Amino acid sequence: MKKLFLGAAFVLALGAMPSMAEELTVITAGDQNMVDYINNYLGPMFEKENPGTTVRAVGTGPGDAGSQKIIERLEAQKQAGKDKWDVDVAVVHEKAAGDLVKDDLLKKYRADIPTGKLVSRENADMALGTDVKGYVMPMFNSQTAIAYNPALVKNPPKSYDELVKWVKANPKQFGYNGIKGGMSGVAFVVGWMYAYGGDVKTLENGPYKKGETADWSKALAALKDFNKNVTMTPGNAGTLDMLARGEIAMGPVWVDMFYTWQASGQIPPDLKLVLLAPGMPGQPMHYVIPAKAEHPKLAEKFIALATSPEVQANGIVKKFNWYPGIDATKVEAKLDPATWNKLFTDIKPKELAQYGKPFPIKPYFDGILEAYEKQVAN
């Protein structure tokens, strides 16, 4: 009887114990703030909701080079024939997401998580010409826009056509960095080509037609003429500096950088933003799950938390001034009015969905930069 009692007690004790501890490994491209965000904010939240689980984030470095290291890591494990890979979740740039899908290195999971249906932007389905629908969830969307000084610009242009007229009437008051010193200038040039260089959908998604770049001569000649009346800035930070000093009245910026500088007092609080029609590019960072992740279900739970309206509101928008990866209208209820108004007063969610564009597919993107050097910069 005593033995039976002890045995029952032992079984009950086992039942009360937490399940076997699991470690979720997340690797992320990008700056150190990406690693810190997961290790210091998102990871502890997930661990609290999933007792016994540990989240470990490792960074691979900024830019496409950081994402390339993730591709190489997964490719090596695939080539080695491993049954389970040592990465559960990866955070990659847009181009890498397409390459990972093409190389059969990812699991299709978006339809299996509750937040999958909250995605609204087309860059979650197409990544620089590659169909990635179902394989990615955007962590956030970064976006370029035109910053302007309302004291100097009473009625800001709403389109590239209106901007051309404004610059002609206000020479040297618009500034950008060309294609040197930062992607804000590159994004402005890409937006110009979307407006005047041919079919936007083809530039965004392909197929690439080699001879099409020859049709850009008119658009590039117009840009060269436009540049005669603009001020060339030293880069992303240089454009903001010149706006702050009143040396220019308007110029392209990264929205998150704009708001970060505004919060720190580096630029005046009354500067505003406008997103030009037919659109300007930005780019997301994507959550992906490797095809043979050791903990795929846990990875899905992690990404569902990371892309929930609450986390998108408090983590992505409040902490970093990024636009949410999911539909912004789903995030509004989770934000205090001041934070929402700061991010969406100038550029409404509807405008962001309509005019926030991806960058072109690589052959067109490279072609635009090369053509700018040859036909505009010289």
Labelled PLM ranges:
Residues 17-21:
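Sec/Tat signal peptide C-region and signal peptidase I cleavage site
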Residues 22-94:
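Early extracytoplasmic/lumenal segment of secretory-pathway proteins
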Residues 79-89, 107-146:
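A structural signal for short loop-to-beta-strand junctions that line the ligand-binding cleft
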Residues 101-109, 130-133, 261-275:
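Ligand-binding "clamshell"
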Residues 142, 220-226, 267-288:
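Periplasmic-binding protein-like
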Residues 188-270:
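Ligand-binding pocket segment of bilobal, Venus flytrap-like solute-binding proteins
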Residues 280-281, 285-352:
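Mature extracytoplasmic/periplasmic domains
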Residues 345-378:
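Conserved C-terminal helix/tail region of periplasmic/extracytoplasmic solute-binding proteins
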